[in-house]
Regions:
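Extracytosolic ligand-binding ectodomains
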Residues: 1-119
């Protein structure tokens, strides 16, 4: 996406020595964060417990959590506060657990990538 959170993630990644805009970097970051937060909520690293809590972590209602706010999110979850993890990619799941998503339509102009639109 081209959201504020995606830009924040890219800047944060660059500050820490990563490219920040490579394929699936934001998605990988978000997947790891969701697992960590679901473990915190479940109080367990058991895969069934994680799976049972991911959608609660990722979807509203709750305090929105962006990239770089994992420590804050862990504290909120530990305190029993609902969160709505947005992360780097605007994480959201459907009722059956499928990722809602968007994608960029890109073109190359003058040797550089240009976004045509986000769908």
């Amino acid at each position: 996406t081209e959201s504020e959170d995606a830009t924040k993630f890219a800047e944060m990644a660059k500050e820490n020595g990563a490219q920040g805009s490579g394929p699936y970097q934001g998605e990988s970051y978000d997947a790891a964060a969701l697992m960590i937060l679901a473990m915190q909520k479940a109080g367990s690293a058991d895969r069934g417990s994680i799976a049972g809590n991911v959608m609660d972590i990722a979807n509203a209602p709750g305090e929105q959590i962006g990239p770089g706010e994992l420590a804050k999110a862990l504290e909120l979850v530990a305190a029993g506060t609902d969160i709505d993890y947005q992360g780097a990619t605007g994480v959201e799941f459907t009722d059956v657990g499928e990722a809602k998503g968007s994608y960029k339509q890109l073109t190359i102009e003058d040797g550089a990538w240009k976004t045509v639109q986000v769908r």
